[in-house]
């Protein structure tokens, strides 16, 4: 099967591509190698280079998805059976810092892809949304819950879901996936678990915004496996799924776990960031039933795997020395 993965050089994306290649699919990537976040150029370049090493032989189109002519040429040339759309602004604070560019990246790019699916009769479109679309929720939120998005990132993600559902009338079989708090090796520093582990490794104070705020932390390999399973299953057409570990962990618990694994550091608890919704665990019963989704890595194991990678990775070794 020919599969086009947008954002295929991202944290989740390169793991998805690896799995598809192992399954002997013909995979292509569109990625402009930009994070849009608060990431040093040196760090981003290193991470992208390391991700590329894990997917040798997969051709990457360095293209802006907002450029409709370029996107049309690529899709017309490949004629993929499925598009897995992972490219996006990465998280809420990045959207808040540049909402106009975010709209181009998250909305215009999606519309361009859907127009190409319509024009070239692409039968399947997989959209990676976010657990943020639910807004405030407690354990265990199901896919049919009323979405009350909080903030522009969540609103744009939910708008994308509705846009995709509208394009289904053109014969595009869609699948919408909602992951949560994905982490793991080759992630950028500017995420919760990355920050906790690296801050502890630097013997600095971990800052927790809201002691009892919870997240459904999901190890990257589990998230990627769920995305691949959903993308290849006929049972998922025109449906929406939660793709998470389905276990809530408070930020304070996560911080203490990071300290315990690293063996040093301290925690400072601050007020909750009101720009972010209060979230719990997501219910993954539907994904289990429809395509056998079964996340393997719990938070304690995932944190340890990530820490061991950080501890032994040359970039982070030098980074820790520079800041010591």
How would you describe each model-predicted region?
Residues 67, 185-189, 247, 295:
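Residue-level signature of the cytosolic catalytic core of signaling kinases
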């Amino acid at each position: 099967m020919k599969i086009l993965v947008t954002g295929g050089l991202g944290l989740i994306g390169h793991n998805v591509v690896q799995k598809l290649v192992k399954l002997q699919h013909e995979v292509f990537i569109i990625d402009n190698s930009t994070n849009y976040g608060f990431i040093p150029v040196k760090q981003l370049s290193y991470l992208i280079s390391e991700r590329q090493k894990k997917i040798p032989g997969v051709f990457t189109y360095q293209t802006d998805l907002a450029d409709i002519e370029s996107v049309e040429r690529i899709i017309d040339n490949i004629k993929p059976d499925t598009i897995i759309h992972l490219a996006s602004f990465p998280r809420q604070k990045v959207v808040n810092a540049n909402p106009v560019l975010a709209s181009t990246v998250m909305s215009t790019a999606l519309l361009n892809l859907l127009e190409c699916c319509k024009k070239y009769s692409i039968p399947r479109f997989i959209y990676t949304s976010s657990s943020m679309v639910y807004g405030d929720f407690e354990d265990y939120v199901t896919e049919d819950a009323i979405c009350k998005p909080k903030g522009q990132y969540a609103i744009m993600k939910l708008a994308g879901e509705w846009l995709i559902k509208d394009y289904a009338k053109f014969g595009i079989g869609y699948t919408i996936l909602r992951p949560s708090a994905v982490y793991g090796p080759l992630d950028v520093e500017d995420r919760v678990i990355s920050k906790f582990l690296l801050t502890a490794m630097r013997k600095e104070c971990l800052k927790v915004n809201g002691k009892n705020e919870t997240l459904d932390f999901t190890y990257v390999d589990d998230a990627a496996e769920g995305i691949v399973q959903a993308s290849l299953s006929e049972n998922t057409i025109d449906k929406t799924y939660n793709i998470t570990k389905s276990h809530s962990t408070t930020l304070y618990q996560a911080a203490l776990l990071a300290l315990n694994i690293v063996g040093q550091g301290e925690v400072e608890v601050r007020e909750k960031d009101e720009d972010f919704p209060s979230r719990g665990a997501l219910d993954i019963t539907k994904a289990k039933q429809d395509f056998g989704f079964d996340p393997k890595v719990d938070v304690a194991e995932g944190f340890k795997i990530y820490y061991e990678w950080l501890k032994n990775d040359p970039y982070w070794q030098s980074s820790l020395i520079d800041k010591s």
